[in-house]
Amino acid sequence: MEESKQNYDLTPLIAPNLDRHLVFPIFEFLQERQLYPDEQILKSKIQLLNQTNMVDYAMDIHKSLYHTEDAPQEMVERRTEVVARLKSLEEAAAPLVSFLLNPNAVQELRADKQYNLQMLKERYQIGPDQIEALYQYAKFQFECGNYSGAADYLYQYRTLCSNLERSLSALWGKLASEILMQNWDIALEELNRLKEIIDSKSFSSPLNQVQNRIWLMHWGLYIFFNHDNGRTQIIDLFNQDKYLNAIQTSAPHLLRYLATAFIVNKRRRPQLKEFIKVIQQEHYSYKDPIIEFLACVFVNYDFDGAQKKMKECEEVIVNDPFLGKRVEDGNFSTVPLRDEFLENARLFVFETYCKIHQRIDMGVLAEKLNLNYEEAERWIVNLIRTSKLDAKIDSESGTVIMEPTQPNVHEQLINHTKGLSGRTYKLVNQLLEHTQAQATR
């Protein structure tokens, strides 16, 4: 069983696309879920920590792993080096940090970056060296795990930095800091800022652009499954052509998260049809229970397959670091996204099954929905009561009878018009491109 859980674990595919500090919450989750032996996780944590300045944390884990009170000599020496380097960077950044901590001095700053740089040089003898020192100090603070300090200094650095590459690096650092502090609103703002820069025409090379989009989507997973509006935001980002192409060519594992968002997000239901076409293209080359569930329901109409996949999907969700967030309620622990997913998945199965059959045996339906007979009956009664379903239950024969629905002429007209407007838009675009090509010859 543990092995099958590990087969669904996307950490080996996701971790290389994250800053190493962002991998720690994933390790914490995997350790809590006991997906891997404790010793294996602790060793991986130490390996990761050795590439950061969080030496005290590494020492604690070493003691826990090897059941000792002593830390290795190299860790003790590394700690001395880190403290000395921090002190040195603190001194180099001190003039600018003192200025930023002085409210009266900060009031002299304006929206004009060039004016600020000149004013700092003339009045406070603060030049490029001190600004560079602030960046190095902020970066070092981040490496030490002081995300709050790093976020503040990186923000200030960006207001003074005139180097675009450095400014971009600082923005990535600011995004990581906000994610690690779980400031989801601010993190979303920083994510959108980064997206704007990455999508701009002036952004380095197309290849670099694709790589940055892939990183952005991976980092965004933390925000999308924690922010109140995240399930809509993930669809709006991942479903854009440029981002969807990047997923299909370089990161198909991200389809799990887009598919989950579509299943639990009723507001984006109209876009699901287009996403099903993507699944048709991808589901032979990339296997994931959540993708396969959608293929069973909407591509193959395989309801027995969908029933099996629902059980696998539940396993996937509770063991996924982004989807399996647990909420403690008294003595009970629940996974809200799992419950929401299963409810909507049943609805998908039911709606599609009902389009094919007009009279449905309740026992068969209960089996397809992974419910017992009484649960299925209650579930359907509730759907009818809340007007989500135009049907009635024949208790004597134990069947659900679907009421024939007349096609809504108004809806059909809107759908045809949408299709026409889409084709017209493409046609106009092609004509414009052709005209521009003629003009440049």
Curated annotation (Swiss-Prot):
Induction: Targeted by the COP9 signalosome to proteasome-dependent degradation.
InterPro entries xref list: eIF3e, eIF3e_N, PCI_dom, WH_DNA-bd_sf
The PCI domain, residue ranges: 223-407
Compartments in which it is found: Cytoplasm; Nucleus
UniProt xrefs under Pfam families: eIF3_N (PF09440), PCI (PF01399)
Keyword field: Cytoplasm, Developmental protein, Initiation factor, Nucleus, Protein biosynthesis, Repressor, Translation regulation
Record-level Gene Ontology MF annotations: mRNA binding; translation initiation factor activity; translation repressor activity
GO biological process terms, semicolon-separated: DNA-templated transcription initiation; flower development; formation of cytoplasmic translation initiation complex; photomorphogenesis; translation
Gene Ontology CC entries for this record: COP9 signalosome; cytoplasm; cytosol; cytosolic proteasome complex; eukaryotic 43S preinitiation complex; eukaryotic 48S preinitiation complex; eukaryotic translation initiation factor 3 complex; eukaryotic translation initiation factor 3 complex, eIF3e
Annotated PROSITE patterns: PCI
Phenotype of gene-disrupted mutants: Several floral development defects, including delayed flowering, reduced sepaloid petals and short stamens. Male gametophytic lethal.
Listed PANTHER family: EUKARYOTIC TRANSLATION INITIATION FACTOR 3 SUBUNIT E
HAMAP family: eIF3e
Quaternary assembly: Component of the eukaryotic translation initiation factor 3 (eIF-3) complex (Potential). Binds to the translation initiation factors TIF3F1 and TIF3H1. Associates with the CSN (COP9 signalosome) complex. Interacts directly with CSN1, CSN4, CSN6A, CSN6B, CSN7, CSN8 and TIF3C1. Binds to 40S small ribosomal subunit S9 (RPS9B and RPS9C) via its N-terminal part. Interacts with the 26S proteasome subunit RPN12a via its C-terminal part. Also binds with At1g27930 and At4g30620.
Comment field (misc): The PCI domain is protease-resistant.
Function: Component of the eukaryotic translation initiation factor 3 (eIF-3) complex, which is involved in protein synthesis of a specialized repertoire of mRNAs and, together with other initiation factors, stimulates binding of mRNA and methionyl-tRNAi to the 40S ribosome. The eIF-3 complex specifically targets and initiates translation of a subset of mRNAs involved in cell proliferation (Potential). Negatively regulates translation during flower development.
Family: Belongs to the eIF-3 subunit E family.
Name used for this protein in its record: Eukaryotic translation initiation factor 3 subunit E
Native source species: Arabidopsis thaliana (Mouse-ear cress)
Name of the coding gene: TIF3E1
